[in-house]
């Protein structure tokens, strides 16, 4: 590779040698190709992205380095400035803008998408774009943005895509090659640090696999299986010897023999085995915090005096800007004590300053045990020697579900620090009550190939309005057809298309045999098929009428009514013992003349005649007693004789039962039957043989049409969604003009500048003046209603203006809610996915914050509101920053100068205190 001068210069500055996959990817990049790199977490994919930065700087061009998360952008900005200096590296996120005109800019993917739609001057001279963590393309919320960027990037820009290992890397690479041109796909499934799988049973740590086995795929460790069998047997014996414990089974009492380890004990075992630092995945924020508290109540200490001094220095640096009044509210002192002992939690509910301090200390090896939610696995650079999984199930917001192989791979991929550890370790804690933590289940997860990448691309209002603005409908359709979603859909119908081709060929052969597609025998067969179809439909309607008539009678029956059961094995006379409880599916309790008692339905009583009479019943009828049934059946027969009830064998006169049988005399059906009788093929020689072939032709024709419908549904779904959205936007005057040449209106240009999940609702609020005349805190509050989502299953509760602190804000919330309801009704009519409804769960909180800046009062008010789960400091900051992002858009896009000025003042009122500290 002597021609690769820049690669030689780049590698000369590295303190390590490149792996083969890194060498191949970098070489392809220097030769002018785009590159897709799929490799495990920690394998060193980012080296390829950093080489793209090197190439851009060496050639005097520009490189944009995109990430899906602001935290990742901040981290990459720090890494690149350490190497190239602050003057050459910029940062653009929703919160920060640093050196935005630098030759290398780190940004979130959304920022680049917005630049592309605005045709920003910053795109001039752009030579390389790095898309880190590109597997986020499968994310429901962020994924579409990635596809928009990939599709809109100029053709001369070299794209470097970095992805975790996915099982369909070749498919994804094939799509990238299709839409971006010459792209080299580099897939490497080799972990640079070997991963050893373990199961912790009680206080004993076992290898999951028998690594000494000579077979190709290591079997489950037999010693582990024997020990678990011994534990289960000991539990059973413990139950057998202790009757009290047997009685407690089912009440949640644990067997005495096996005791689950407390978290401090697990960490102590890992420490003794030399397996720290470790990340323990807990899958709930509360569980992470509780785990640290458990450890703090124990004697566990993992740091030396020297390490504690270094930890204190980092804490003071990270948290020095926090107000003293806020520290106690934030749980600072307990958090600090945990860090000094080498323990920490890590989750999205933490204050960003706290979370970043944990990341820095863990990466430095000063914090030894972190209890984290799975969000830590999403790209944050915090590798550990060991990863511990307490459970192999997690709550997905609705129910507890097992981890998928892809999730297991992503979590355990954190184990093993390249350049530090010789090997990484994954430890699953065994629980006797959970099948998912059994060795076979764990082995299945550990052995499975990783998750497939699935597109989540679907047109949004903002995307649609921008496409209409920049290109014709035909070009927009063509662009949508180039999406990864459409690429996958097209590949999925390959088999269907082949089926259509085979059907078409067979239909042609049969048609030739019968005399062409208009052959008389085919016309005759179609007549027969149409008649049969109409007869089936009439039969269905007739059965429905009979059932409804029977249900009407059954629902009207009263205690003591005598009826005639016309169908089933219980046919004959019966008396009603108890009326039906449910009129939609009436099932009265009856006793028959043959002494059977039970509930009947329309299937037993297919008649519409009124009861034939009635009889007096005792106040209480114990129908389960044989003697009572015998006496009552005798009384029933006597009453029937007295009332001259006809025998069931006489049948029921269909002309008198009240059904609407006019459908049986359908003129169209009569006409078709007449045509069939007169048809020239009716008495043709060899009719039966020809008819069999003709009917086969029709069966294949129907199947072929079914295949074609499936293909059409799969291959045109995005274009149809786009056209429906265009139709709604035309109706609302965001777009005008003929369908073949639509033009974006002033309101449409406003919508094109709003980037939010509720983009169209925000645009409607701006153009209708729903948010006019508000004060800064009120504007921040109403903006939060179109962004905030209550956590858990609580959902938005009550009227959206229920918590409005001022009449002006209440009116704005009501106006917003009405606009949302109208929009959702229009979406339903146009068959578009419904927009989310406004949620008032953050209204009072951010109003209080914008007015007072008092964190203690704000969090106390949030807890007192009872609006879903308690609001953590981290969530509070995160939602405030989302509000800031939309307020910043209003400051630039709102049509009214007063509203723009109010948005600017609202930004200042919200961006203070903990919200302004350590934005990330």
From Swiss-Prot:
ATP binds at residues 39-46. GO terms for molecular function: ATP binding; helicase activity; hydrolase activity; nucleic acid binding. GO terms for biological process: nuclear-transcribed mRNA catabolic process, 3'-5' exonucleolytic nonsense-mediated decay. It is an enzyme of class 3 (hydrolase). A motif (DEVH box) lies at residues 132-135. Pfam families: DEAD, DSHCT, Helicase_C. Gene3D superfamilies: 1.10.3380.30, P-loop containing nucleotide triphosphate hydrolases (3.40.50.300). GO terms for cellular component: Ski complex. Residues 26-184 form the Helicase ATP-binding domain. Belongs to the helicase family. SKI2 subfamily. This is Probable helicase HelY. It comes from Mycobacterium leprae (strain TN). The lineage of its organism: Bacteria, Bacillati, Actinomycetota, Actinomycetes, Mycobacteriales.
């Amino acid at each position: 590779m002597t021609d690769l001068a820049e690669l030689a210069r780049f590698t000369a500055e590295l303190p390590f040698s490149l792996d083969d996959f890194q060498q191949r990817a970098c070489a392809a990049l220097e030769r002018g190709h785009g590159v897709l790199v799929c490799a495990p977490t920690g394998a060193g994919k980012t080296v390829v992205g950093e080489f793209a930065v090197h190439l851009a700087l060496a050639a005097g061009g520009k490189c944009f380095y995109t990430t899906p998360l602001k935290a990742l952008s901040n981290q990459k900005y720090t890494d690149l400035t350490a190497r190239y200096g602050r003057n050459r590296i910029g940062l653009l996120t929703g919160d920060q803008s640093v050196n935005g005109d630098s030759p290398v800019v780190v940004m979130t993917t959304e920022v680049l998408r917005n630049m592309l739609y605005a045709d920003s001057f910053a795109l001039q001279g752009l030579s390389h774009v790095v898309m880190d963590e590109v597997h986020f393309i499968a994310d429901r919320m962020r994924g579409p943005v990635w596809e928009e960027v990939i599709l809109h990037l100029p053709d001369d820009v070299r794209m470097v895509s970095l992805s975790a290992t996915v099982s369909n890397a070749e498919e994804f690479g094939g799509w990238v090659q299709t839409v971006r041109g010459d792209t080299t796909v580099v897939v490497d499934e080799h972990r640079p640090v070997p991963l050893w799988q373990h199961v912790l049973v009680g206080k004993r740590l076992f290898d999951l696999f028998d690594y000494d086995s000579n077979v190709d795929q290591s079997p489950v460790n037999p010693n582990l299986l024997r020990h678990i069998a011994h534990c289960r047997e000991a539990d059973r014996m413990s139950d057998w010897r202790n009757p009290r414990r047997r009685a407690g089974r089912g009440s949640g009492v644990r067997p005495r023999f096996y005791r689950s380890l407390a978290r401090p004990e697990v960490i102590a075992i890992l420490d003794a085995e030399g397996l720290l630092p470790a990340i323990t995945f807990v899958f709930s924020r509360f569980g992470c915090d509780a785990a640290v508290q458990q450890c703090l109540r124990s004697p566990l200490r993992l740091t030396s005096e020297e390490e504690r001094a270094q930890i204190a220095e980092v804490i003071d640096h990270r948290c020095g800007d926090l107000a003293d009044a806020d520290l106690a509210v934030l749980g600072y002192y307990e958090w600090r004590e945990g860090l000094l002992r080498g323990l920490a939690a890590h989750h999205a509910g933490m204050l960003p300053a706290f979370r970043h301090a944990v990341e820095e200390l863990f990466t430095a090896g000063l914090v030894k045990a972190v209890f984290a939610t799975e969000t830590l696995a999403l790209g944050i650079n915090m590798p550990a020697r060991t990863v511990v999984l307490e459970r192999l199930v997690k709550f997905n917001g609705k129910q507890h579900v097992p981890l998928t192989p892809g999730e297991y791979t992503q979590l355990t991929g954190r184990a093993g620090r390249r350049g530090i550890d010789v090997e990484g370790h994954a430890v699953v804690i065994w629980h006797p009550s959970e099948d998912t933590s059994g060795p076979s289940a764990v082995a299945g997860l550990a052995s499975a190939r990783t998750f497939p990448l699935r597109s989540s691309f679907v047109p949004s209002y903002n995307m649609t309005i921008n496409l209409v603005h920049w290109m014709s409908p035909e070009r927009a359709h063509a662009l949508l057809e180039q999406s990864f979603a459409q690429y996958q859909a097209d590949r999925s119908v390959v088999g269907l298309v082949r089926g259509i081709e085979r059907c078409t060929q067979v239909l042609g052969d049969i048609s030739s045999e019968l005399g062409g597609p208009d052959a008389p025998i085919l016309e005759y067969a179609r007549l027969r098929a149409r008649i049969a179809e109409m007869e089936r439909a009439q039969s269905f309607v007739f059965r429905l009428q009979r059932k409804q008539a029977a249900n009407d009678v059954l629902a009207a029956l009263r205690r003591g009514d005598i009826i005639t059961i016309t169908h089933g094995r219980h046919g004959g006379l019966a008396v009603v013992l108890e009326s039906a409880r449910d009129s939609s599916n009436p099932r009265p309790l009856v006793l028959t003349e043959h002494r059977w008692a039970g509930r009947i339905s329309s299937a037993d009583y297919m008649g519409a005649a009124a009861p034939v009479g009635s009889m007096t019943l005792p106040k209480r009828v114990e129908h389960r007693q044989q003697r009572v049934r015998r006496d009552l059946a005798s009384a029933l027969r006597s009453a029937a004789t007295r009332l001259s009830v006809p025998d069931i064998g006489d049948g029921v006169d269909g002309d008198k039962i009240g059904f609407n049988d006019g459908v049986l005399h359908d003129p169209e059906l009569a006409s078709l039957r007449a045509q069939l009788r007169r048809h020239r093929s009716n008495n043709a020689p060899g009719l039966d043989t020809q008819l069999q072939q003709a009917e086969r032709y029709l069966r294949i024709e129907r199947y072929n049409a079914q295949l074609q419908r499936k293909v059409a549904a799969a291959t045109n779904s995005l274009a149809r969604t786009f056209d429906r959205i265009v139709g709604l936007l035309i109706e609302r005057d965001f777009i005008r003009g003929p369908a073949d040449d639509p033009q974006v209106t002033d309101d449409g240009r406003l919508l094109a500048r709003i980037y939010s999940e509720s983009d169209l609702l925000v645009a409607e609020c701006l153009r209708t003046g729903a948010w006019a005349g508000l004060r800064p805190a009120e504007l921040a509050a109403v903006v939060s209603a179109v962004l905030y989502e209550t956590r858990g299953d609580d959902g938005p509760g009550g009227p959206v203006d229920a918590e409005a602190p001022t009449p002006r804000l209440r009116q704005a919330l009501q106006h917003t809610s009405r606009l949302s309801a109208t929009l959702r009704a229009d979406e339903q009519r146009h068959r578009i996915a419904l927009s989310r409804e406004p949620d008032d769960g953050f209204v009072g909180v951010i109003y209080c914050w914008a007015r007072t800046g008092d964190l203690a009062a704000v969090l106390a008010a949030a807890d007192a509101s009872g609006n879903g789960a308690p609001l953590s400091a981290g969530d509070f900051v995160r939602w405030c920053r989302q509000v800031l992002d939309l307020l910043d858009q209003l400051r630039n896009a709102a049509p009214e100068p007063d509203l723009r000025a109010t948005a600017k003042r609202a930004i200042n009122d919200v961006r203070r205190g903990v919200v302004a500290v350590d934005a990330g």
